[in-house]
Amino acid sequence: MINFLNDIRNAENPISNNRKLINTIAILFLGIALGTFSKYLDFRQAELPSVLMAINGVLDIGNFLGRFAIWILIALCISIYSNSAIRASINVFVFFVGMVASYYLYSNYIAGFFPRSYALIWFGFTAVSPLLAFVCWYAKGKSKLAFILSALILAVLFNMCFVYGCWYFNAKSVLEVIVFIIGLIVLRRDTLRSSALMGTISIVLAFLFNIIIPFHLG
């Protein structure tokens, strides 16, 4: 199994334990900061500083942060730029623990309500995030399987960023368009041709997923 996984992608040059700890703590605090900011933006919309209120009014950042796409992109970046698949699992799990905990602690103790059904979805997603991160880390490998993984990840991201049917196609917001473009850049292959092929296959897969499972996460 180890040889099979190494054929997909090898671990990067090892880093010191101190560096690993610093990176993981930084990712934890990033999650805490983003979770707190997301809930603050949602709860204090009428009391935001004028500049932030104007930006939020144009881009609807509050609702954007309430959907899945941006968090999947951040987790993807943390995963594939981690030193190894195991480190990807740890870092992504720590990020979601920080983000989800800070968001719902703010919601419960400052905003004064606790949306149990949504919280359970995020708790469940956090629980499985190490496994997903482990798999996603291999998407930046050089093998055909890595190529397929990249296309599958982009297909899922596509369906989180766009809504479409027989006679319509819309982006959820301009920010989601940016998220998908960044996803393409992050998962790009060695050549433009391969990257274009990956993007095309991912869109075809997204349409197939939409037919088989016509349910989009946030």
Please annotate each region the language model reported:
Residues 1-100, 104:
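N-terminal topogenic module of multi-pass integral membrane proteins
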Residues 26-38, 156-160, 180-185, 202-207:
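Hydrophobic core segments of alpha-helical transmembrane domains in multi-pass membrane transport
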Residues 69-79, 125-137, 177-183:
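Hydrophobic cores of alpha-helical transmembrane segments in multi-pass inner/ER membrane proteins
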Residues 131-144, 184-198, 207-210:
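Membrane-water interface at the C-terminal end of transmembrane alpha helices
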Residues 161-173, 180-196:
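Membrane-helix boundary connector in multi-pass membrane proteins
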Residues 206-218:
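Juxtamembrane boundary at the C-terminal end of a transmembrane helix
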